[in-house]
Amino acid sequence: MADDDYNEVDDLGYEDEPAEPEIEEGVEEDADIKENDDVNVDPLETEDKVETEPVQRPRKTSKFMTKYERARILGTRALQISMNAPVMVELEGETDPLEIAMKELRQRKIPFTIRRYLPDMSYEEWGVDELIVEDSWKRQVGGD
């Protein structure tokens, strides 16, 4: 009964479409190059430049680690330690991964880099060992 509703409407015309002609890629490009030989074109600079050596520029951001950076670093490092990552400090009976991460931060042994983005979408990278950290007892750790 449902087939009766579609008497001659079954053909939607998909098979009757002509095949697209194959385009030779080199032919049109060569013609464009010959027409524009006298135009000087500089290569476009992309935002994702790969620098071989980090350039030491004067830093714009604070040398103090924020409480948000501290929380993220301690949490990330504690997760790594809980998944059997090598510990960078001597243990004195500590078993809690968060306590071990705090000890590593106090001794400036965490091998992380913090990337701080600026409003113009550029960024500064700081090593954890470069930043001044205030731990939860308001005792300053590190810095110059």
Swiss-Prot record:
Location of the protein in the cell: Nucleus
InterPro entries: DNA-dir_RNA_polK_14-18kDa_CS, Pol_omega/Rpo6/RPB6, RPB6, RPB6/omega-like_sf, Rpo6/Rpb6
Pfam families: RNA_pol_Rpb6 (PF01192)
Compositionally biased region (Basic and acidic residues): 46-56
Region (Disordered): 1-62
Main location: nucleus
Entry keywords, A to Z: DNA-directed RNA polymerase, Nucleus, Transcription
UniProt GO cellular component terms: RNA polymerase II, core complex; RNA polymerase V complex
Subunit and partners: Component of the RNA polymerase II and V complexes.
Entries under PANTHER family matching the protein: DNA-DIRECTED RNA POLYMERASE SUBUNIT K (PTHR47227), DNA-DIRECTED RNA POLYMERASES II AND V SUBUNIT 6B (PTHR47227:SF4)
Family: Belongs to the archaeal Rpo6/eukaryotic RPB6 RNA polymerase subunit family.
Any GO molecular function: DNA binding
Gene Ontology annotations of biological process type: DNA-templated transcription
Protein task: DNA-dependent RNA polymerase catalyzes the transcription of DNA into RNA using the four ribonucleoside triphosphates as substrates. Component of RNA polymerase II which synthesizes mRNA precursors and many functional non-coding RNAs. Pol II is the central component of the basal RNA polymerase II transcription machinery. It is composed of mobile elements that move relative to each other. Component of RNA polymerase V which mediates RNA-directed DNA methylation-dependent (RdDM) transcriptional gene silencing (TGS) of endogenous repeated sequences, including transposable elements.
Compositionally biased tracts (Acidic residues): 1-32
Organism: Arabidopsis thaliana (Mouse-ear cress)
Protein name from the UniProt record: DNA-directed RNA polymerases II and V subunit 6B
